[in-house]
Amino acid sequence: MSSYQKELEKYRDIDEDEILRTLSPEELEQLDCELQEMDPENMLLPAGLRQRDQTKKSPTGPLDRDALLQYLEQQALEVKERDDLVPYTGEKKGKPFIQPKREIPAQEQITLEPELEEALSHATDAEMCDIAAILGMYTLMSNKQYYDAICSGEICNTEGISSVVQPDKYKPVPDEPPNPTNIEEMLKRVRSNDKELEEVNLNNIQDIPIPVLSDLCEAMKTNTYVRSFSLVATKSGDPIANAVADMLRENRSLQSLNIESNFISSTGLMAVLKAVRENATLTELRVDNQRQWPGDAVEMEMATVLEQCPSIVRFGYHFTQQGPRARAAHAMTRNNELRRQQKKR
């Protein structure tokens, strides 16, 4: 056994816990600082983590900030500036840049006929503006002045080219009047199968109760005279869509159905599309602009319905996928061609 190993043997039976219990708090803190794993070569670590904490030392004296600043300022003034390697002599080298003078092109003297000279000399600013527009000098005026002079047979720019352009005064367009349809009376006429009632238009009536719309769809099942049924912007949801689907399975006289701009989800649209397959009289279907996008599965179902239902010749929906859009366009072209051939017979 070597001497080094013999030296280590006497430390094997030492009780480390007993030694730690006899250390003071200051000694324990110093021991903890010594045992910290530091990596001074790791440049990715901050400086405080690459070395031991050295800021807990007691101050060597009082700190006087003003005296320290005064000392630093005095030291900076007393330090002699370093001399230049090559002294500056003030000599200017090279030639200064002088902007070359540009020659102003001489304007060509244009001689006009005496009649034109006299007419132009006595023309007003408004007439000069119209003449410039006729000659195509649109860079001298605004677009409004140019098109007013070209399109109007009279002098429109009465103040000349440099005048302030006034905007056109458009006539106010009033809002469309509300839908005057009486829902209760409409429901009675549908239930009584009125011969004169061929269109049910409830567009933009947003306070219709759901039970009333459900009763209207229920009455449409046995109606044989209504050709168009429109529920645009009525805040209809999936319950109304299911009622419309049940109506389509039994009604055999309806030709146009419009349920655009509502709150129908993909489930409600899928129910309507499945019911359209069982209806052979419907020629127009519009389901666009719902509150949420129906999804790829619904768009594929729309294309399949159009392919399987040759009676539909008008379909209102903006496809977002190329595949269903191409299939639907091909199906609509085929359906319209079949309708045209039937009319020729």
Curated annotation (Swiss-Prot):
One of its GO terms (biological process) is pointed-end actin filament capping. Residues 336-345 have a biased composition (Basic and acidic residues). Keywords: Actin-binding, Cytoplasm, Cytoskeleton. Residues 40-64, 326-345 are annotated as: Disordered. GO terms for cellular component: striated muscle thin filament. It is found in: Cytoplasm, Cytoskeleton. Belongs to the tropomodulin family. Blocks the elongation and depolymerization of the actin filaments at the pointed end. The Tmod/TM complex contributes to the formation of the short actin protofilament, which in turn defines the geometry of the membrane skeleton. Binds to the N-terminus of tropomyosin and to actin. This is Tropomodulin-4.
